[in-house]
Every structure is written in C-alpha cells, then in structure tokens.
Design a protein with these regions (language model features):
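Amphipathic alpha-helical segments enriched in hydrophobic/aromatic residues interleaved with Lys/Arg
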Residues: 98-156, 181
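Short, conserved glycine- and acidic-residue-centered signature motifs
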Residues: 33, 172, 176, 224
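Cytosolic nucleotide-utilizing catalytic cores of signal-transduction proteins
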Residues: 133-138, 168-174, 188
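Generic protein-terminus/edge-of-domain signal
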Residues: 1-61, 68, 74-76, 93-106
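Basic/polar phosphate-binding segments, predominantly the helix-turn-helix DNA-binding elements
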Residues: 178, 182-226
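Short, Lys/Arg-enriched N-terminal segment that forms or immediately precedes the first helix
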Residues: 159-167, 215
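A short hydrophobic beta-strand segment most commonly corresponding to one strand
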Residues: 77-95
C-alpha cells in the first residue's frame, strides 16, 4: 500500500544532530510526542527500549514512535557517534499522526541499509557544515531516508503494523492533510476559518475540532506558526 500522498506529505524537521558519546555518557528514560530516528554511525551503545536492554552497533537504526520510552548509556571502554532526527507533521495513510507502521523500534532495513546509511552520513555533513541551503538539502535527504524506511517495512517485514484507523478517522486525516497543504501554500494571504472550511466543503466548527485534535493547534494558530 502507499503510505503517503506526495502532495500533502511534508514532515517538519525539528532537529538533526550527531553527538559523539564517550564512556559514562547516559540519558534518562524519556519519550517524545513526535517521531525520532536514532542511527548508529560509529561505535556501539547500550539502549533501553520499553524496558528491554539492547546492545546496538554500527548501522543500527531505531525509530521511536510517540510515547515509546527509551534511554541510552555508554559502557566503559565504548563510544558511539549517532545521528538523531526529530520529525513532526508526519501523516501516513491509515496511521495516527506522527506514527510509522513499525511494531518494534529496532529496524532491519535489509537491502536498503547501505543506501540509508550513505544518506545518513550526508545529512550529518549538511547540518554540520551549514553551507548555503543546507536545510533544503538535508530535508531532501531525510525524505529519501523515510522512503527507504517505509520500503523496508513493506518488503515482507514482520515488524509492520496494519492500518490502525477507522474509515471515519481516515477521512478526517485526509481532510487535515489537505487543510495543512492549503495553509502552507497560501500562508501569505488573509485566510479565515470560514474561508478555509469553504475550500474543503466542511463546516468551520467540524474543521476546527478535528484539526486541533490532529495537530494540537487550531487552523489559524497553525497558519501563524507557518508564517
């Protein structure tokens, strides 16, 4: 199945950074209300994911959906170089907002692993060097990485969740996606809630309710955020 609509799929990159972790470094157990991808570029690390410890090495890719608790530490005599990417405004067909269809955080990319890691290193270079248009270049690479992740989850993986939304929720998801698309492409114009609702053939009250449930913002506050 196709998880994305090219016209409306437009994730927001919250951060992309690549820390060097020395022995003794650790993070407390935490979770996010957005997507996070963690990639082991070099070295090894000890991760705790939903209460289960895992030793991970070079090439390991973990994708933490919202609410997935995780922590990490560096054992004595070890180090790691990791890339962490935070993403929001991610909408995939049949799934709750900001969720990917993986059952487990630890991913097996199979034949896509080499291409994925090559792009991860390029993302690291773009965000570290910050040359002209690095954010655009970085976003393009991250979109390709997301495409590879989705392909790996579709190709016979036992780590793939089935669509979790009802037909009503799917219709609401499409409505929110098109509202977001319209706001992002007309943000310089004067737009009222009534005008937006008219464009989408729904009532202002209904649009406002489902938009805020999906994004945490009202349509007009989202427009202000985009501006």
């Amino acid at each position: 199945m196709a998880y994305t609509h090219v016209q409306t799929f437009n994730p927001e990159i919250l951060y992309a950074f690549d820390p060097l972790n020395e022995a003794g470094n650790c993070s407390k157990t935490h979770s996010h209300n957005f997507l996070e991808i963690s990639i082991l570029l070099e070295g090894e690390a000890d991760y705790l994911v939903d209460g289960e410890r895992q030793d991970v090495g070079i090439g390991t890719v973990m994708l933490f959906n919202p609410g997935v608790k995780h922590a990490e530490r560096q054992k004595e005599g070890t180090f790691s170089h990791q890339l962490h990417i935070g993403l929001t405004n991610v909408s995939l067909n049949g799934l709750p907002r900001n969720h990917f269809p993986n059952k487990r955080a630890l991913l097996d990319l199979g034949c896509y692993a080499d291409a994925f890691m090559e792009k991860a290193w390029r993302v690291t270079k773009e965000f570290n060097e910050q040359r002209s248009e690095y954010q655009l270049m970085g976003k393009g690479l991250i979109l390709e990485m997301l495409g590879l992740l989705l392909r790996s989850l579709e190709d016979g993986s036992d780590n793939t969740l089935p669509p979790a939304l009802s037909q009503t929720a799917v219709r609401q998801q499409h409505l929110v996606n098109h509202a977001v698309y319209y706001l992002e492409n007309h943000h310089s114009e004067e737009i009222t809630l009534e005008q937006l609702a008219q464009q989408l053939f729904v009532s202002p009250a209904h649009l406002s309710k489902i938009f805020k449930e999906a994004t945490g913002l009202s349509p007009i506050h989202y427009l202000i955020h985009v501006r």
